[in-house]
């Protein structure tokens, strides 16, 4: 089911646009579909046919996604394992201070070497209402004021569904445009389409290295944009929407944590409308990568910040409960057979 399908379903029951808007807003807030106001109860506002049909619509919406399990962490975050209608699993993460990270694909075709999700390949796309349903489930647990599309999957490979979800959340969902964050490895289609949208989200770009060859090794199936081209495209979007680009950099000890790389960041980002997010690597079973020491991370932040690049450390939420993206799902689906979608269909 997509957004237009939901509106058509309600229209078939006799709902006018005003009724549809109120019903959809109630769902997006995690409330009952017939939730109205103290001054105007449902029986005074919704047509009889709509009221009679809402229980079935509610059941259909509940069937889009359900909470399989919740895993609270010591840092105030909570990782949600969400089961979709076909029993596929995705992860979303409730973050401190009202944030939520949602998944846009089951699996991923980019194959980043430091990401658990990429190990499974792409299994299927997540529909727009399946993304929104992750927000609904989260809002039933705590307030959600910011949604980042940084969970499982590459949003640019599911662009229509992601943009539809962003539009719905940025209008009826009541989330400010700057508080909707589209994360991508840098697909050119993103830079073409985002400026044309009614809801223009903030943008996070996966950089990870200023050396083109190393970046290709770390993100083997990312579009062939050089780091310089990626930053130029990001800067153009930032100036158009008037909020900075977030550049993502997973810190891997001995690989991309050298001062030479930090100087490369200064060369690319100094004077740009940008924030550099350094993300200490979250280890996975059976890999050879490690995060730098805490002292080294502090040194790198100070090095960049003191030379004119706003730099923050973004630790993976819930590190004590399989905090890296895709790790919780991998543990839950261990031993089950899964069919991958070839990368060319991504």
UniProtKB/Swiss-Prot annotation:
<dbReference type="GO" id="GO:0005737">
    <property type="term" value="C:cytoplasm"/>
</dbReference>
<dbReference type="InterPro" id="IPR040072">
    <property type="entry name" value="Methyltransferase_A"/>
</dbReference>
<feature type="active site" description="S-methylcysteine intermediate">
    <location>
        <position position="325"/>
    </location>
</feature>
<feature type="binding site">
    <location>
        <position position="108"/>
    </location>
    <ligand>
        <name>[4Fe-4S] cluster</name>
    </ligand>
</feature>
<comment type="similarity">
    <text>Belongs to the radical SAM superfamily. RlmN family.</text>
</comment>
<feature type="disulfide bond" description="(transient)">
    <location>
        <begin position="101"/>
        <end position="325"/>
    </location>
</feature>
<feature type="binding site">
    <location>
        <position position="282"/>
    </location>
    <ligand>
        <name>S-adenosyl-L-methionine</name>
    </ligand>
</feature>
<feature type="binding site">
    <location>
        <position position="112"/>
    </location>
    <ligand>
        <name>[4Fe-4S] cluster</name>
    </ligand>
</feature>
<keyword id="KW-0411">Iron-sulfur</keyword>
<keyword id="KW-0963">Cytoplasm</keyword>
<dbReference type="GO" id="GO:0008173">
    <property type="term" value="F:RNA methyltransferase activity"/>
</dbReference>
<feature type="binding site">
    <location>
        <begin position="153"/>
        <end position="154"/>
    </location>
    <ligand>
        <name>S-adenosyl-L-methionine</name>
    </ligand>
</feature>
<dbReference type="GO" id="GO:0051539">
    <property type="term" value="F:4 iron, 4 sulfur cluster binding"/>
</dbReference>
<feature type="binding site">
    <location>
        <position position="115"/>
    </location>
    <ligand>
        <name>[4Fe-4S] cluster</name>
    </ligand>
</feature>
<keyword id="KW-0489">Methyltransferase</keyword>
<keyword id="KW-0949">S-adenosyl-L-methionine</keyword>
<keyword id="KW-0004">4Fe-4S</keyword>
<dbReference type="InterPro" id="IPR007197">
    <property type="entry name" value="rSAM"/>
</dbReference>
<feature type="active site" description="Proton acceptor">
    <location>
        <position position="91"/>
    </location>
</feature>
<feature type="domain" description="Radical SAM core">
    <location>
        <begin position="94"/>
        <end position="320"/>
    </location>
</feature>
<dbReference type="GO" id="GO:0046872">
    <property type="term" value="F:metal ion binding"/>
</dbReference>
<feature type="binding site">
    <location>
        <begin position="206"/>
        <end position="208"/>
    </location>
    <ligand>
        <name>S-adenosyl-L-methionine</name>
    </ligand>
</feature>
<dbReference type="InterPro" id="IPR004383">
    <property type="entry name" value="rRNA_lsu_MTrfase_RlmN/Cfr"/>
</dbReference>
<feature type="binding site">
    <location>
        <position position="183"/>
    </location>
    <ligand>
        <name>S-adenosyl-L-methionine</name>
    </ligand>
</feature>
<dbReference type="InterPro" id="IPR013785">
    <property type="entry name" value="Aldolase_TIM"/>
</dbReference>
<protein>
    <recommendedName>
        <fullName>Probable RNA methyltransferase PA14_40730</fullName>
        <ecNumber>2.1.1.-</ecNumber>
    </recommendedName>
</protein>
<keyword id="KW-0808">Transferase</keyword>
<keyword id="KW-0408">Iron</keyword>
<dbReference type="Pfam" id="PF04055">
    <property type="entry name" value="Radical_SAM"/>
</dbReference>
<dbReference type="GO" id="GO:0070475">
    <property type="term" value="P:rRNA base methylation"/>
</dbReference>
<keyword id="KW-0479">Metal-binding</keyword>
<keyword id="KW-1015">Disulfide bond</keyword>
<dbReference type="GO" id="GO:0030488">
    <property type="term" value="P:tRNA methylation"/>
</dbReference>
